[in-house]
């Protein structure tokens, strides 16, 4: 990564806690580390959502947190918890004030929209600093069903926070941004059609190839009672309807009729407790309780995370919607074959039959199709290994974080140039 000026890049996600880790957290942490190596002083400024302490060092990067609320009348504790987990449109005046006062700011990097994005926009404008926005979870490419799930906690609730949205220009964030970064190609194409400016670029997520190259898969199997000769199917993602683990469970049940020794491991934080309950019920009704392990989400620095990839024979990501799919890069770096949904950013990431296999999660035959692909890989170990090795080469050649960091620095400079021209 090119030498950056010794000033602060302020990253602003909606929440950031080690115990509820996902792709967005990985991206923010890794690009912050790249910025540190280049001489910069990144800081993560966020809300107290799901957190127990105000300030914390995570992975060598300072995280500052601030009180917040959801400005709706009538929210229950369960509603607030659901909004914390996913999609909550929060308000934090103390965070806004901190953004306004943070010293030596070079640039603001928003990793959220809505009111929080508006706070970043307004702080940047008041301070005459550039700001960029990354679209991690998708904005223009989100299925209606998923959007409805995210909005359910505020259904029929009176919102008293609209004046703050107007004050902070929440609906102008993307139009006013000095640069908009899309992690998925499909999101990029839609953003170019909808936004009135051309300050938009595709920048994929990256992976720490070295971290995932080696791992003790045998130790993971032994810890969780999985025989050494079992064909192990792995999914690591949020336990959420978007991630579609129910389809994987149904396909696995069918696959086990051909491969009785097969095991399935699901790992991830439960962002939809009701969906997690549905999965556990499905495990029981399909009589899979001895062959399926549902494990809680793991911290990014847990050795067991890497061990899980190396324990697996195949990694499956059956998402209904996926802007990018950073876990595919992690599976590739571990040399594991991948089966992924032909949706969103995955369509540009995976080459069918070369670096992975595609499945259509919306097809009437999706369960049978996925079961057949699992059977194909289990029955042809050579092909399974070749897919994994091709993925490893792809990750090393195009997605190492150092490369992504250099490209991000180029976008920062374009954002700075735009801000100078429009000061």
Protein language model annotation of sequence segments:
Residues 320:
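Aromatic "clamp/platform" in nucleotide-sugar-dependent glycosyltransferases that forms part
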Residues 297, 307-312:
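Short alpha-helical donor nucleotide-sugar binding micro-motif in glycosyltransferases
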Residues 337-340, 350:
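Short hydrophobic beta-strand element within catalytic cores of glycosyltransferases
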Residues 276-299:
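Nucleotide-activated donor-binding/catalytic signature segment of Leloir-type glycosyltransferases, i.e.
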Residues 186, 206:
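Carbohydrate-associated surface elements
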Residues 118, 126, 139, 157-179:
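Membrane-proximal helix-turn-helix segments that form the acceptor-binding/catalytic region
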Residues 10, 227-243, 249-252, 265-267:
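Conserved donor-binding/catalytic core segment of Leloir-type glycosyltransferases
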């Amino acid at each position: 990564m090119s030498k950056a000026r010794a000033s602060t890049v302020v990253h602003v996600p909606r929440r950031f806690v080690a115990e509820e880790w996902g792709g967005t957290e990985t991206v923010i942490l890794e690009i912050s580390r790249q910025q540190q190596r280049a001489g910069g002083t990144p800081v993560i400024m966020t809300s107290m959502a799901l957190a127990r302490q105000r300030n914390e060092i995570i992975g060598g990067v300072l995280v500052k947190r601030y009180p917040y609320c959801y400005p709706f009348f009538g929210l229950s504790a369960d509603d607030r918890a659901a909004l914390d987990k996913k999609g909550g449109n929060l308000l934090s005046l103390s965070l806004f004030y901190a953004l306004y006062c943070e010293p030596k700011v070079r640039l603001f990097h928003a990793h959220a929209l809505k009111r929080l994005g508006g706070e970043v926009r307004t702080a940047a404008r008041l301070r005459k600093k550039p700001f960029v926005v990354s679209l991690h979870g998708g904005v223009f490419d989100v299925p209606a069903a998923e959007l409805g799930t995210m909005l359910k906690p505020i259904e029929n609730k009176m919102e008293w926070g609209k004046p703050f949205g107007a004050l902070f220009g929440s609906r102008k964030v993307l139009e006013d941004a000095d640069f908009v970064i899309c992690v998925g190609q499909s999101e990029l194409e839609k953003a170019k059609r909808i936004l009135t400016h051309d300050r938009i670029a595709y920048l994929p997520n990256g992976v720490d190839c070295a971290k995932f190259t080696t791992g003790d898969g045998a130790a993971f199997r032994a810890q969780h009672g999985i025989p050494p000769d079992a064909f192990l199917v792995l999914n690591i993602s949020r336990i959420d309807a978007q991630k579609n683990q129910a389809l994987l469970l149904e396909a696995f049940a069918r696959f086990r009729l051909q491969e009785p020794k097969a095991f399935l491991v699901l790992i991830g934080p439960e962002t939809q407790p009701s969906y997690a309950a549905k999965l556990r019920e499905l495990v029981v009704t399909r009589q899979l309780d001895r062959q399926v392990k549902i494990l809680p989400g793991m911290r990014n620095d847990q050795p067991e995370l890497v061990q899980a990839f190396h324990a697996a024979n195949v990694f499956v990501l059956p998402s209904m919607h996926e802007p990018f799919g950073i876990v595919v890069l992690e599976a590739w770096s571990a040399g594991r074959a991948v089966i992924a949904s032909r949706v969103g950013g995955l369509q540009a990431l995976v080459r069918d039959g070369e670096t992975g296999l595609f499945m259509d999660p919306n097809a009437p035959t999706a369960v049978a199709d996925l079961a057949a692909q699992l059977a194909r890989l289990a029955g042809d170990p050579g092909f399974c290994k070749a897919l994994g090795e091709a993925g490893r080469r792809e990750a090393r050649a195009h997605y190492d974080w150092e490369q992504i960091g250099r490209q991000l620095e180029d976008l920062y400079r374009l954002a700075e140039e735009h801000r100078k021209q429009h000061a």
